[in-house]
Structures are given as C-alpha cells and as structure tokens.
C-alpha cells in the first residue's frame, strides 16, 4: 500500500518537473533569462564622451539629447558633435537599457531533440516589455530607434533555442 502511494506521488511530481518540455517551463526559463539580459539601445557600449560627424550617427544621439539623457557640444571647426551623459543619463549609460522582455505566450516549440549533449527545442514566443523608462517612450525616441519602437509596442515576437539541464530549461550561452 505504501509502495502504491509512493508511485502516485512520484508520478505527480514528475508531471510538474522543471525539465518537462511545457510552455509553463519555457515561460519560467525565458523570463529568468530576460530579467538578466535587458534590451538596450546600444548592444556594444559606446565610450563617452562620444564624438560623431555623420548625421546618421547623430540622429539617435540627438534623440537622447532631447530626452535630457545626453548633452551635446558642437565643435564647428572640425564638424564634430560631442555627446556626454547628463546626471539622469549617467544612470542608463553607456548602453541605455530600456527594460526587459516579459513572456506573454508561447506560440510554438519544436519537439526536443539531442544537440550538443543536451535536449534542445526552438521556442517561438510573444512578449511585452517591462520596466520601460519614461525617456524611452517618446515619439522621437521611437523614430530614432526603430528596434526599440517594435520591442516596446506590446506586440513583440521572438524565437530562441532552449536547452534542458538538471535545473530546468535555459538559454544556452
């Protein structure tokens, strides 16, 4: 009788395993990953003060000036604009992160298959952005940073590989 109860308990625990290929487990894994990997305007951090001569480079920086995240100093003799973070901008500089993804739904996933020594799956998901700062919400910022505009629109979609480990599903490095 005790053995039968143990089997039932083991079966119930197995249904809620962190390693099971379920949308709920994928949501947990992706939210944990994105909490540690925010979305940023500059994936590679620029060095400040940042100097620009090309109008295409200056447009996004000027949007940050308008939002009081940067100041600009123009050197007309050498046609350079020099950008420096303001006190408010210093908190977000140098990458100017604008929040992190929160998974809204798992649309689909491939059957887990062995790859690189782990079970892996491709997950397609929808997300919204969480903790978006006020400076990232203006029309000028959206125009200057189209990828940010899409990410913060509330209708973001993504696709990622997840790998299963003893601790559950994770995004491989």
Over which residues does each language-model region extend?
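Basic amphipathic alpha-helical segments that dock to polyanions
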Residues: 55-71
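Post-signal peptide N-terminal segment of mature Sec-exported envelope proteins
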Residues: 22-44
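Bacterial N-terminal signal peptides that target proteins for export
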Residues: 1-3
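Bacterial signal peptide processing site
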Residues: 16-18
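Accessory beta->alpha helical hairpin/"wing" motif in late/C-terminal subdomains of nucleic-acid enzymes
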Residues: 71-101
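Short amphipathic beta-strand and strand-loop transition segments with alternating hydrophobic
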Residues: 99-116
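Short beta-strand edge/turn micro-motifs at domain boundaries
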Residues: 122-136, 140-173
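C-terminal motif of bacterial Sec signal peptides marking the signal peptidase cleavage site
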Residues: 11-14
